[in-house]
């Protein structure tokens, strides 16, 4: 039976030390089939998922996708616009989907949410429970994601890029999609988040050289 996957995402690396807010005009917005048309063949994580889904003969149900360059805290209008569109579309399709696949950054901060992705995943979890629907929720994240317990507790799997610069972002999405495929076969998957005690300086996290090259 063909799997139907609801595909959406919001991607922003927020720099809270910047005073200027990031507004709706700063975001590139794709809705419905535009997500597939604008991303197919462009080498993005979304493109990676589209390719994997095609090979698996999955049906992609596109929702909303938003992305902006790294910048300041995201304003409330963006929150409202994204939430409204995402949950309206999810509500319309939720009875006929087998999974949710999300393209996220993992370090987005908005006016009302210090952990935007964690709060967003929690809202999805509550939505599905209220509908008495149980489907996997899988997300691909940026290497620089601030992975929170809330993200882990409210998702089936989050999988981050491994390289900096992010030359593997497309491959990471394919890997996340392959994990979703495995989950369809064996849904009893436990997700574990191992935290580090260290804060790594940006100058030391390039994965082409040591120490990160040896670690990874």
Language model features: what each stretch is:
Residues 2-55, 206-207:
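N-terminal amphipathic/basic leader segments beginning at the initiator methionine
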Residues 45, 52, 185-216:
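Accessory alpha-helical/coil subdomains and C-terminal extensions
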Residues 46-49, 83-96:
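Short, charged beta->alpha transition segments
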Residues 6, 11-13, 27-28, 74-80, ...:
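Active-site histidine-anchored catalytic micro-motif
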Residues 57-65:
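Short beta-strand elements in bilobed, periplasmic/extracellular small-molecule ligand-binding domains
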Residues 68-73, 105-110, 165, 196-205:
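Active-site-proximal beta-alpha loop/turn segments in soluble metabolic enzymes
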Residues 54-58, 74:
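Glycine/alanine-rich phosphate-binding loops at beta-alpha junctions
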Residues 65-83:
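Charged, often glycine-rich, active-site loop that binds/positions anionic groups
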